[in-house]
């Protein structure tokens, strides 16, 4: 049976409202911070309280079980006879007071394993393996402040020691030969599409309400965009921040938003990469359980929705630590893991290796890291993942003006590359690729207001043209659906 795709729109960078909490510290001085610090949850659940006093907390009203995978921040804590208690915000919403014992303290969390392909032209930065680091209060510390016994690993396996204050950890970084992993580009390109132009740079428009004329308010009606048989319908309006907003976090680790770069959807779990700046290579992954989050609109208003609704949403939204994501546009996922090609989009081409991250969906932490190369003088900017052992990559060969499609298959820690197709032309002459995915035997390549459908061998099939005038920030194919993320 011939399979067709239905389009689904994921819209990002919308408004999250303001909520002012009324929970108090009574008769005790609080240690306050000018800007919020980021806290890292532990594995044990603790009660959350309305109030604290010198004698301890009172007014228990909920548990941390709903919030431990969210973005947790705080601007103050108090010392009581029962220990320190922190006044926490979760995903940008004021929640209440919790014991400092809830946070993981004096801890360095690292990837479970790292396998580096031997390459004298590239050195793996060992701090890229850090999930998070915490001090004695459970406050997150910037990975750059961690001392390492070796900053880079390139051609020989090494055990690297990490330390910050009382926190210590070590990691064996394996270097494999990479023999037989790289492929050769030897396929004849298929005829391509007629080249078109589009607008360049940032979005030229916005959703209905996210503009000055409507005072940057939340969306209340969905969108439908049609082209050449492809129909895109809104599935979710994301919150602008999944944290406190502009200027409220003490550093880049705290703010989750506002720049989306890539998406992946698998089994109803939608994940996007979020950055504070387009120049950052570290950021956060945010996962939404669409099986539980049925509303298209409610997630925009995490800070103002009913408390019972917020608890449910908080349990179904997960935020990763502040980790290396590279450009963050190339994502994929399986039932258990999220995959990221953590490449450098400012590096045009050359002999450098690239990083693949495997991140657990369960706790949003890095499980494995591999570095790889697909072929001589080919650096990948766009990729997608199918299951746990397959990556498809897109490479634009400027010298020959064609796109190459590569399949990388994992066996153990080796990623073996094979060219599977090629297409003549650049498709859009004045805009970079904004999204790339694979589904039902076809590649989908997104540019601003354009999506191209290409057979696995490079056969040009369909060109979808839109007039949305908002940046596409990632594509993902899952089942019969094609998911498209629009900014603004």
Give the role of each language-model region.
Residues 255-262, 323-330, 373-388, 426-437, ...:
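Repeated scaffold domains used in trafficking and secretory/extracellular systems
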Residues 137-180:
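Serine/threonine-rich, repeat-prone extracellular segments and beta-strand-based repeat modules
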Residues 31-54, 106-140:
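Solvent-exposed, low-complexity, repeat-rich "mucin-like" stalks and linkers
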Residues 278-297, 346-358, 399-410, 448-455, ...:
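Structural motif
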Residues 1-28:
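Sec-dependent N-terminal signal peptides of Gram-positive bacterial secreted proteins and lipoproteins
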Residues 29-87:
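Beta-loop motif signature
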Residues 185-254, 266-316, 351:
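Beta-propeller domains
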Residues 89-107:
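Boundary regions of SH3-family modules and the immediately adjacent low-complexity/disordered segments
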